[in-house]
Amino acid sequence: MSIRRKLAATVATGAFVVVGLATAIPAASAAEGDGNCTSNDAGAGGDLCLYFNSYEAGARFNDPYTDNYAGWVFKAWTSGTAGGSNGAGVAVKNNAASVQNWDTALTGYVYYNSNQQGLKQGFSAFTAGNLVSGLKNNNASQGW
């Protein structure tokens, strides 16, 4: 076999292996909170819950510490007769309309930019409300 044919066969085999690997690797899925907003996460205070819709409606995202919403999605939830699924699976970053603070003492803040930067809105302990127009569907992180 000539060098050209060997090289062509090697390249073709390598391409087949690369294509096979590319199709065998599953796509990474977005992370989601458990959807259970609580006032005590293992002694760490409570969750700051973001909702897809105004007035604490629709799917929600909960986490006490998120300095960047990228990669997180809203999750459908139910609790007794309440619940929401509108927006489930949608990215949290730049898609929240309202917030509920389940912390027992701290004010939770939602920020326009990642890493607690830019315009922010605070929610005192055990309060809720709609995000202001500059943050509604323009949210990137949270902090205390």
Name each model feature, range by range.
Residues S2-A22, P26-W144:
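Compact beta-sheet-dominated domain cores in extracellular/mature segments
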